């Protein structure tokens, strides 16, 4: 069973109390109902009521009505003649929230008494209020909207809006405000969201004038602001919309909008801006809309939009833009609407819209675009999502095949109000999504090239948007292209110009004159105009020559030629040039010819000669200017082989002017060439790098031990830079030079011949250059000659020499007399005109008794072994026969004074010919000779010319001389065969030949009166050695002559020191001159020089 609710169970208990309360209420109700729930007060006179709104506007009221109902929430007193407000009239309006007092004659902000506290919106526009008094606003504690526009307020001070106000929207537009004090709105910083200051007289905004962190909209349009300084709007952290249109702003300094990181919309239209740069837009990272129309913008700097990468809509209409360069719109990847209408754009660079991947609407109406559509391809590359393109009202006369390349997503294309005359085949074919194509032209050239267009338009259902009428040929003029039969589109002529001569790319040097030539042909008589473009911009004041002539082959075709002259070209003339030839039927564009202006390189830094020490760093500078910028290259000694490069000690920076070589070495020394080269030419400059090094010895000197009479050499191979000067010292003093001391060039080799005991000592090689001096030493030790004569007194030597000479002379003359008598018995002398040479007389004896050339070969052996020998008491140096084979190539003479007849102590030389034969040199007596004893390392090998075995016993002297010439070849050798012989050491003894010769000549002349078989001494002074043997020629003469010659020769052959000359043959017996001389003879032979 359910329990009863509490109300039911408790009803009996509450009934008395409830009844008592109801009784009291009924007793008091009549009084309170009369006071509060009486009848509603009527509307004020001359006002209308609508709900809780009381409308008293437009009544011409000069004073407030007295019967304003208390229930009024919205009171409209606008459009009256109120000049003052009686606050008492608002005493009972406790519900009042909106008060409209606009369009009256109030001169100050009125006070509404107690009702001011609840007023939320106060409209005071179009009055005559002169100022804003902060004290008058203190009572409006609930005020959120205050409209003071269209009054006569001239200034806003910091005291105008005291703290504590809750104004959210403040309108001060259309006043006369010219002074805007910094911090004037600080009292509203906590509440103000919208501030309108448009249509005032503000000329300058103070920096940080607005410290309103909650403000979202700021309207400053139609003022007189000329410049926006940086940080002007700092403090407006929440600003979203800024209106600055219709001012006189000509420049935005860098950071002008810094701090507006949340701003979405910026209005700058109708100002005087001339350019767009990134610095002025710095900080607008959240900007979505930028309105820049109706300015004077003529250029957009590179990266001008780099801080507006979230921009969705950009309005640049009604400006002075003439071209869109490749990077004019870079980094606007989020842009969806771009309006560029009503500019003067005539050139759109290829790739100008590259990167605008989000762009959907592109407005290019009312520009001067022609070539972009007629000639350029790829201008719209990158607009993959573009859906609408408007080119209404441009100067397009033809549409190229690839004009709209890259617009595959295009849906709306407007080409209206263009005098289009031709459209190339498939110009719109790639626009698969095209839904609207607007064309309106009455100038179409209806030839065979337009035949494709009508069926294509009808196939895509686009003919409704196209108004196209033929203008040529005359038969189709005025007809719509859709009504012309396909067979009527023919090409009987070519009224549109056709290029036949293209301008050519060229290169020029600064200051030269250049010209470009371009020719076209046309069958039309329509006037032709010529223009030249440079980098796709028309040259306004081009220096042109234009010609026209009738083509020879057909008189109906005209050829037109235009020549562009560029005089005294500079760098500013560089670019791509193109000619445009136009008539009524269209324009023809030539290829683009590039002009490159070059300047020969010239040095700004020239390398200089330097001299540095080894181990340091060499620094060579070289820099040059030119156009294009020259490339710098280095060479060493005309090549690219750098020792420093191989060793990684060379450093050349690509962008630096300095060439470094570290840890410099001698190998780095040379001439370094800096070459600056560009397409105009090249120039070079040389610098010599001299490496300085202290002297040093490359090969150390060694101590030497030699024997008396030998030759010793000291080699001092010095290195250093500059080349060291070498000086030889002995015992610390300058070396005393004699004829035995010889030097090679540079004194690096010192040779001492025939050394003597006095030559022993310490030899010093002193090497010096400007960097220092170095010394090297060598000790020379001299050993006495074994087996040769000992040191003795001069008197003893002289005595022994005299005795030996007398003995030898006697023995020699005994042999001579014996041989002479023996020969005289064997041969008889006939008194004929011919001289008969005995059969056993060798051919080197002439018919006139003179000694003819003996065919001898002298072989010098380098480095041969030294033969042992000793000197007998008679002064003859005997050799060991065991050391002399048949061909003696290693014979060595003893170091005995040499006697060469016909020579004085003057030195004599040998000149070696190119074929290794020796040429005789003259001595003091102008005769050639060979020393009687052989020098070291030299062997003499006689090679007598064999006598023809078939030769008859008698022969004429002419035949003998002919026979001698035939068997006298010059054999290669390293000595002399013509009587010249190189001394191995020592000087020559003095000769008495000058005294012997005249005596012998006289004797011979007196004895040979008839000239027959006489001993001619004309060549006596050229004999190498005096062979002390009987002469065959003397033997054949008279005994008196022979005896005189013997006595005279024996007397004069003594030298001044008392010694007789050494016999040429060291053997005890003489060998007769007959037959053929064999090679077994080991003694020296008589060497007779050639006559």
Swiss-Prot record:
Got any disulfides in this one, which pairs? 47-56, 446-470, 448-491, 518-579, 622-674, 716-765
- Which residues point to the Cytoplasmic side? 818-1091
Which residues does UniProt assign to the signal peptide? 1-34
Specify the domain of life of the species encoding this protein: Eukaryota
Q: Domain named Ig-like C2-type: which ranges?
A: 497-596, 601-690, 695-781
Q: What Gene3D superfamilies does its record include? A: Immunoglobulins (2.60.40.10), Ribonuclease Inhibitor (3.80.10.10)
- What happens without the gene? Mutant mice are born at the expected Mendelian rate and initially display no visible phenotype. One to four months after birth, they develop skin abnormalities including alopecia and epidermal hyperplasia that are reminiscent of psoriasis.
Q: For the region Disordered, what residue ranges are annotated?
A: 912-990, 1059-1091
Q: Which residues cross the membrane?
A: 797-817
Comp. bias intervals (Basic and acidic residues): 960-969
Q: Which GO terms describe its cellular component?
A: plasma membrane
Q: Which residues are glycosylated?
A: 76, 152, 248, 294, 320, 385, 686
Q: What is known of its domains?
A: Contains LRR and Ig-domains that can mediate low-affinity interaction with EGFR. The LRRs and the Ig-domains are each sufficient for EGFR/ERBB1 binding. This interaction is abolished only when both the LRRs and the Ig-domains are deleted.
Listed under subunit, the entry gives: Interacts (via extracellular LRR and Ig-like domains) with EGFR/ERBB1, ERBB2, ERBB3 and ERBB4 (via extracellular domain). The physiological relevance of the interaction is controversial; LRIG1 may have low affinity for EGFR, and interaction may occur only when high levels of both proteins are present.
What this protein is called in its record is Leucine-rich repeats and immunoglobulin-like domains protein 1
Give the originating organism: Mus musculus (Mouse)
Taxonomy, top ranks, is: Eukaryota, Metazoa, Chordata, Craniata, Vertebrata
């Amino acid at each position: 069973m359910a329990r009863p609710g509490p109300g039911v169970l408790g009803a009996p208990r509450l009934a008395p109390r409830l009844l008592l309360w109801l009784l009291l209420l009924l007793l008091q109700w009549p009084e309170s109902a009369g006071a509060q729930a009486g009848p509603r007060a009527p509307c004020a006179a001359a006002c209308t009521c609508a709900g809780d709104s009381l409308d008293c506007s437009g009544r011409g009221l000069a004073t407030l009505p007295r019967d304003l109902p208390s229930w009024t929430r919205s009171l409209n007193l606008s459009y009256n003649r109120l000049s003052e407000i009686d606050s008492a009239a608002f005493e009972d309006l406790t519900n009042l929230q909106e008060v409209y007092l606009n369009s009256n004659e109030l001169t100050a902000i009125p006070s509404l008494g107690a009702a001011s506290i609840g007023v939320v919106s106060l409209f005071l526009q179009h009055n005559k209020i002169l100022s804003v008094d902060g004290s008058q606003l203190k009572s409006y504690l609930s005020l959120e909207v205050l409209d003071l526009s269209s009054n006569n307020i001239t200034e806003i001070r910091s005291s105008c809006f005291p703290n504590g106000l809750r104004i959210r929207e403040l309108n001060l537009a259309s006043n006369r405000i010219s002074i805007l004090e910094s911090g004037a709105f600080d009292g509203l910083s906590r509440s103000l969201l919208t501030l309108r200051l448009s249509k005032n007289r503000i000329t300058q905004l103070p920096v940080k004038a607005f410290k309103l962190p909650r403000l979202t909209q700021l309207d400053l349009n139609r003022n007189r602001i000329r410049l926006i300084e940086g940080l002007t709007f700092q403090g407006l952290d929440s600003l979203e919309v800024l209106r600055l249109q219709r001012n006189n702003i000509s420049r935005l300094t860098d950071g002008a909008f810094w701090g507006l990181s949340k701003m979405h919309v910026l209005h700058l239209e109708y100002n005087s801006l001339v350019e767009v740069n990134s610095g002025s837009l710095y900080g607008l990272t959240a900007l979505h809309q930028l309105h820049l129309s109706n300015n004077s913008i003529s250029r957009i700097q590179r990266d001008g939009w780099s801080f507006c990468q979230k921009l969705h809509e950009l309005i640049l209409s009604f400006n002075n833009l003439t071209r869109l360069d490749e990077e004019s719109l870079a980094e606007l990847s989020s842009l969806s609407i771009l309006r560029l209408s009503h500019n003067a754009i005539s050139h759109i660079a290829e790739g100008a819209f590259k990167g605008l991947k989000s762009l959907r609407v592109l407005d290019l109406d009312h520009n001067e675009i022609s070539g972009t559509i007629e000639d350029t391809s790829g201008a719209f590359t990158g607009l993959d999502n573009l859906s609408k393109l408007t080119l209404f009202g441009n100067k397009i006369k033809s549409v190229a095949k690839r004009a709209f390349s890259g617009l595959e997503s295009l849906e709306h294309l407007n080409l209206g109000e263009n005098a289009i005359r031709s459209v190339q085949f498939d110009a719109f074919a790639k626009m698969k999504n095209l839904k609207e194509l607007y064309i309106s032209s009455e100038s179409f050239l209806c030839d065979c090239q337009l035949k494709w267009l009508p069926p294509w338009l009808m196939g895509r259902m686009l003919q409704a948007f196209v108004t196209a009428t033929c203008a040529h040929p005359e038969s189709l003029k005025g007809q719509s292209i859709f009504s012309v039969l396909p067979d009527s589109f023919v090409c009987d002529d070519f009224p549109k110009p056709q290029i036949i001569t293209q301008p050519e790319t060229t290169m020029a040097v600064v200051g030269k004159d250049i010209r470009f030539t371009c020719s076209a042909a046309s069958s039309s008589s329509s006037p032709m105009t010529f223009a030249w473009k440079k980098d796709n911009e028309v040259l306004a004041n081009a220096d042109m020559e234009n010609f026209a002539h009738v083509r020879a082959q057909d008189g109906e075709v005209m050829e037109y030629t235009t020549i562009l002259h560029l005089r005294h070209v500079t760098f500013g003339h560089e670019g791509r040039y193109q000619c445009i030839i136009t008539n009524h039927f269209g324009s023809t564009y030539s290829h683009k010819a590039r002009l490159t202006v070059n300047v020969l390189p010239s040095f700004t830094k020239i390398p200089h000669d330097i001299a540095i020490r080894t181990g340091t760093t060499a620094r060579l500078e070289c820099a040059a200017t030119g156009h294009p910028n020259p490339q710098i290259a280095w060479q060493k000694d005309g090549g690219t082989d750098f020792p420093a490069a191989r060793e990684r000690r060379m450093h050349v920076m690509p962008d630096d002017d300095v060439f470094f070589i570290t840890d410099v070495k001698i190998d780095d020394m040379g001439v370094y060439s800096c070459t600056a080269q560009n397409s105009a030419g090249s120039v070079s400059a040389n610098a010599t790098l001299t490496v300085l090094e202290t002297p040093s010895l490359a090969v150390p000197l060694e101590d030497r031990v030699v024997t008396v009479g030998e030759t010793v050499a000291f080699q001092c191979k010095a290195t250093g830079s500059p080349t060291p000067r070498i000086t030889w010292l002995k015992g610390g003093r300058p070396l005393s030079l004699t004829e035995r001391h010889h030097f090679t060039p540079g004194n690096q080799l010192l040779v001492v011949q025939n050394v003597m005991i006095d030559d022993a000592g310490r030899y010093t090689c002193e090497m010096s250059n400007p960097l220092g001096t170095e010394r090297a030493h060598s000790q020379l030790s001299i050993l006495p000659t074994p087996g040769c004569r000992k040191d003795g007194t001069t008197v003893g030597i002289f005595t022994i020499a005299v005795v030996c000479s007398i003995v030898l002379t006697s023995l020699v003359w005994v042999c001579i007399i014996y041989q002479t008598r023996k020969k005289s018995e064997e041969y008889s002398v006939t008194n004929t005109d011919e001289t008969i040479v005995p059969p056993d007389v060798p051919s080197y004896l002439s018919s006139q008794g003179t000694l003819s050339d003996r065919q001898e070969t002298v072989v010098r052996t380098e480095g041969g072994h030294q033969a042992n020998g000793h000197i007998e008491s008679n002064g003859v140096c005997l050799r060991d026969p065991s050391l002399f084979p048949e061909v003696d190539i290693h014979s060595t003479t003893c170091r005995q004074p040499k006697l060469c007849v016909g020579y004085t102590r003057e030195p004599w030389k040998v000149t070696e010919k190119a074929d290794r034969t020796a040429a005789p040199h003259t001595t003091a007596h102008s005769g050639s000779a060979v020393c009687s004893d052989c020098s070291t390392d030299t062997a003499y090998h006689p090679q007598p010319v064999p006598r023809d075995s078939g030769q008859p016993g008698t022969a004429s002297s002419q035949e003998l001389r002919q026979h001698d010439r035939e068997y006298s070849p010059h054999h290669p050798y390293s000595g002399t065969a013509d009587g010249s012989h190189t001394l191995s050491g020592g000087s020559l003894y003095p000769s008495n030949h000058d005294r012997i010769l005249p005596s012998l000549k006289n004797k011979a002349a007196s004895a040979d009166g008839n000239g027959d078989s006489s001993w001619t001494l004309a060549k006596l002074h050229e004999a190498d050695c005096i062979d002390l043997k009987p002469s065959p020629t003397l033997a054949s003469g008279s005994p008196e002559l022979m005896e005189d010659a013997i006595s005279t020769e024996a007397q004069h052959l003594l030298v001044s020191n008392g010694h007789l000359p050494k016999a040429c043959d060291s053997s005890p017996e003489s060998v007769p001159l007959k037959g053929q001389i064999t090679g077994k003879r080991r003694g020296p032979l008589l060497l007779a020089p050639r006559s």
